[in-house]
A protein has these predicted regions:
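Structured catalytic-domain cores with a bias toward divalent-metal coordination
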Residues: 1-104
Length: 104
């Protein structure tokens, strides 16, 4: 993954993960992007999940490299249908938001 990030040089990174404490976790210059997504899924926006995460994607890409990075921490225990219904619009908005933002 490190080599992919280095070679692809992404302008932003969006990842999804399941966690007991659902949230829109932002790293690097991603706060406005995260707040836009949180408005759709009503998850809190966080910059820290409460414990050290050395080696995680957000720490590496967001904090160390300065790439806007969001980890959408999806609520555990939701059915597949509920995850799709809630998060497909969030993922779509993530892409649309980024397209608008980078155009400014």
């Amino acid at each position: 993954l490190v080599e992919l990030i280095r070679s692809a040089a992404p302008a932003a990174i969006l990842s999804a993960h399941s966690f007991n404490r659902y949230q829109v976790n932002v790293n690097g210059p991603a706060r406005a992007w995260g707040e836009a997504l949180a408005g759709l899924c009503h998850y809190p926006v966080t910059e820290d999940i409460g414990y050290p995460t050395p080696g995680c994607l957000g720490t590496y890409a967001g904090r160390e490299l300065g790439i806007p990075t969001i980890t959408l921490e999806i609520e555990r225990g939701l059915s597949r249908e509920a995850v799709i219904a809630l998060h497909l619009p969030v993922m779509r908005e993530a892409l649309l938001f980024w397209e608008k933002w980078k155009g400014n």
